[in-house]
C-alpha cells in the first residue's frame, strides 16, 4: 500500500512505537532504531519509560504525553513535527492508541498533514486473544469497562449491548476488580466459555480456560 503523502514536505513523522508488555525481549529492532534516531520521544509516563530507554542505552530526549494533557500536548508535538522533527510515541506498555493515549495525537497529525506510521509489536489484547483457545475469526475489544464509581449508567449500557454480542469479547480488568466484572459479564452473557489471562509474556504467565460459573465458584 502506498504511504500517505505529506502535505508539508519538510515536516517530520510521528512513529507509533509498540513496547513490551512484560518481556523486554519482545521489542523489535525497528522500534529500537526508531527510538534512537527520533528527535523526541513522547511517553505516557517518563518515569516509567526511562527504565526501558536506559536498558537499551537510548539517550533521546523525552516529554510526557498522557490522558490529562493529550489535547494541548498534541498541539505542541504537531508544531514540532511541522518544523521537521521526528517524534516517537510510546506508552507504558503495548501499542499506542490501544486503550492508551495516542488517538488524539494521530488525529491532529492527519489534520496538519503530518505523516503517521505505526511500528507493529506487543499488544495485550491480541496476545490474550491468540492464546485464549476461543474464536479468533471475529472479535470485539472493549478495553476497560467504565467503573461503577465513575459511570455506572455507561457500564450498564455497555453490558446491555454485550448481551447481543456473539463474537469473542476482549475485556481488560485490574485484579482487584476482576471478580465484580466477571459477575457482571456472567449476568449479561450467561455461562459462556471464557479465558482469563494474567502476567502475559512474563515468567508467571497463565491462561485460565474455564466458564463464568467455574471461575466464580
Residue ranges and their predicted role:
Residues 74-123:
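Glycine/small-residue-rich loop that forms an oxyanion/phosphate-binding "nest" at active or ligand-binding sites
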Residues 6, 11, 167-168, 172-217:
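A contiguous loop/helix-start segment that scaffolds small-molecule binding in enzyme catalytic cores
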Amino acid at each position: 500500500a502506498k504511504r500517505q503523502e505529506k502535505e508539508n514536505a519538510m515536516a517530520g513523522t510521528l512513529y507509533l512505537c509498540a513496547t513490551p508488555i512484560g518481556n523486554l525481549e519482545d521489542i523489535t529492532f525497528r522500534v529500537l532504531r526508531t527510538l534512537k534516531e527520533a528527535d523526541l520521544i513522547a511517553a505516557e509516563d517518563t518515569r516509567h519509560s526511562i527504565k526501558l530507554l536506559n536498558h537499551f542505552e537510548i539517550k533521546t530526549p523525552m516529554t510526557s504525553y498522557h490522558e490529562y494533557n493529550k489535547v494541548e500536548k498534541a498541539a505542541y508535538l504537531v508544531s514540532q513535527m511541522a518544523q521537521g522533527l521526528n517524534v516517537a510515541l510510546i506508552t507504558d506498555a503495548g501499542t499506542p492508541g490501544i486503550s492508551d493515549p495516542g488517538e488524539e495525537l494521530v488525529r491532529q497529525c492527519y489534520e496538519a498533514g503530518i505523516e503517521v506510521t505505526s511500528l507493529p509489536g506487543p499488544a495485550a489484547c491480541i496476545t490474550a486473544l491468540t492464546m485464549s483457545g476461543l474464536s479468533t475469526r471475529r472479535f470485539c475489544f472493549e478495553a476497560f469497562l467504565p467503573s461503577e464509581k465513575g459511570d455506572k449508567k455507561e457500564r450498564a449500557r455497555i453490558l446491555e449491548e454485550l448481551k447481543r454480542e456473539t463474537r469473542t469479547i476482549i475485556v481488560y480488568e485490574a485484579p482487584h476488580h476482576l471478580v465484580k466484572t466477571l459477575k457482571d459479564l456472567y449476568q449479561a452473557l450467561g455461562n459462556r466459555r471464557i479465558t482469563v489471562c494474567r502476567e502475559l509474556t512474563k515468567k508467571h504467565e497463565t491462561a485460565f480456560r474455564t466458564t463464568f460459573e467455574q471461575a466464580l465458584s
